[in-house]
Amino acid sequence: MNSNEALITKFYTAFANADAKTMSECYHPKVHFIDPAFGLLKEEQVSKMWEMLLLKSKGNLKIEFSNVKADDTIGSANWIATYNFSKTNRKVINKISAEFIFQDGLIIKHTDNFDVWKWSKQAFGLTGYLLGWTGFFQKKVQSQALSALKQFQKI
């Protein structure tokens, strides 16, 4: 295992242990994070997002990760998050593909990809099934996620 594979492993092990501080230590101060739920987050927003998600999960979040691969500049991993979605209390099993870029021994860019329609069907039931594939619905979810993060950052 090289140092960047060890860094990815450290990140997801901390995530599985609900350790937001250690997760944050894996990121470069100028980190960019992108995913379908939040869109683009930068710098301290990224660590605050993970902290918020861990607090909202109230210990009911299961993280599994696999296929950790990295070289000197890029890396990837697959991970699965199992939790109850806070707005509906519906069980979600989200399968995510992550890509990383490294700088100065830390993660400078983190991109998570997942099937938004599949996620929305689990999180919202029939509404997600009918509307989850639409750009309108996806933008609404993203807007609500960003609003929750902004409120959390004020605390």
Annotate each predicted stretch with a short phrase.
Residues 3, 45, 92:
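Soluble or luminal CAZymes and related metallo-dependent hydrolases
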Residues 21-22, 29-75:
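A solvent-exposed, acidic/Ser-Thr-rich amphipathic alpha-helical stretch
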Residues 11-15, 27, 33, 38, ...:
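Aromatic side chains
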Residues 8-11, 23-24, 31, 46, ...:
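Hydrophobic pocket/interface hotspot
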Residues 1-17, 21, 25, 29, ...:
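Short, low-complexity N-terminal intrinsically disordered segments enriched in polar/charged residues
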Residues 7, 45-46, 116, 137:
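Alpha-helical structural motif
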Residues 54-64, 69-155:
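A beta-strand edge to alpha-helix "cap/lid" segment located at domain peripheries
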